[in-house]
Design a protein with these regions (language model features):
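Active-site neighborhoods and metal-handling regions in enzymes and metal-associated proteins
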Residues: 1-361
């Protein structure tokens, strides 16, 4: 029933935008629409949606996996001697305006475009995006559960249950990953551990640096649980922080709170960014805040909507997004504070409740 409803809704969106056919491949539009996760193989898997039908094109060796999924589509299983791109083009038929999945591999897209010369193309995000961006009650429940599981790991970090001093960043990252799985995640998407001067690199890759007394340790981690993602960032300090770090954290907390409170239904996405950025700019940290304030989250860790200057999209009920301002002083230290928020008619609802202090260990 769920996937039949989603296909009906995407057809309505196609009709309203004058799109005659939709083609999605690997990525998350496919499982969102029909519940099937395609393996990222050199063999093409594609879902073709037209006003009349939905057809899933899969390599024959993948067909047994499809049998366990909802039967809301016709199935075409191609043999190794077949041309799956030609089969897909045939299903698109005479459609003139075609939406193509953002994550279709170039090796297939280039060949498909040869078959579809003279057509008009748009991105699938234009027709599937409006469905995915507003989470329903079940999706919000999944985000709550994933956020709570990530919170439990963050609590272990703050309590000192995850040893830090004397271990490498990579060792701590592996420890956090194992704990995410133990708390119910199916997949770990990332576990950033950045200590000392490495914390000034927002997406630092945990490495061989040994964590020591006097370090700030930034931990940004998340995974997928029952199809939906978690994402949280907390920092701890090994020993008492120096005055500039303590002041920066106080300012960062105020900036994050301002961003969360700005994320109300009817406000624009950029207003979240503006609220956090204004606090840090007025506190003298503006030049050290080097990224947007947030990103959407759902089946993907990063998806629409983005909390960034210039995004005038109004926030609507069911929009789920991060609020994660940061301060990064190159060669010295960095910090970030992140929670996931869902916009509701009653105001922003946080998915994360772990304390937001700079915990001293």
């Amino acid at each position: 029933m769920l996937f039949a409803q989603r296909l009906a809704r995407v057809r309505d969106e196609m009709r309203s935008q004058g799109v005659d056919a939709l083609v999605v491949s690997v990525g998350f539009d496919l499982p969102f629409l029909v519940g099937y996760h395609a393996m990222p193989l050199e063999r093409l898997t594609a879902l073709v949606v037209t006003p009349e039908c939905a057809t899933l094109v899969v390599p024959r060796l993948e067909a047994p996996r499809v049998e366990h999924h909802p039967t809301v589509f016709d199935l075409v299983a191609w043999n190794e001697t077949d041309d799956p791109v030609a089969i897909t083009a045939g299903l698109i038929g005479a459609a003139q305006n075609v939406a193509i999945g953002d994550q279709m591999w170039a090796r297939f897209l280039v060949e498909l475009l040869k078959h579809l010369g003279g057509r008009q193309f748009v991105r699938s995000v234009d027709v599937v995006g409006p469905l995915r961006i507003q989470k329903d009650a079940a999706e919000i429940e999944a985000l709550v559960a994933a956020g709570a599981a990530a919170d439990r790991v963050a609590a272990q970090l703050q309590s000192g249950a995850i040893p830090l001093v004397g271990r490498t960043e990579a060792q701590v990252s592996a420890d956090i990953s194992a704990r995410l799985l133990a708390e119910g995640h199916d997949v770990v998407n990332f576990a950033i551990v950045a200590s000392g001067e490495n914390a000034a690199s927002p997406h630092h890759h945990a490495g061989a640096r040994v964590i020591r007394h006097g370090d700030i340790v930034l931990c940004d981690f998340g995974g997928t649980m029952n199809g939906y993602c978690s994402d949280i960032t907390r920092c701890v300090h090994i020993g008492e922080p120096p005055p500039d770090v303590a002041r920066a954290w106080s300012d960062l907390r105020r900036a994050q709170e301002a961003g969360v409170m700005a994320g109300r239904v009817g406000a624009t996405c950029e207003s979240v960014d503006s609220a956090s950025r204004q606090v840090l700019t007025e506190a003298g940290w503006g030049e050290f805040f080097i990224h947007r304030t947030g990103h959407g989250i759902g089946m993907e860790a990063h998806e629409e909507p983005y909390m960034v200057s210039g995004n005038h999209l109004p926030i609507a009920p069911g929009h789920a997004f991060s609020v994660e301002p940061g301060i990064y002083v190159a060669g010295k230290w960095g910090m970030r504070l992140e929670d996931i928020v869902v916009a509701t008619a009653n105001g922003p609802l946080r998915m994360n409740t772990t304390p937001r202090e700079l915990v001293v260990l």
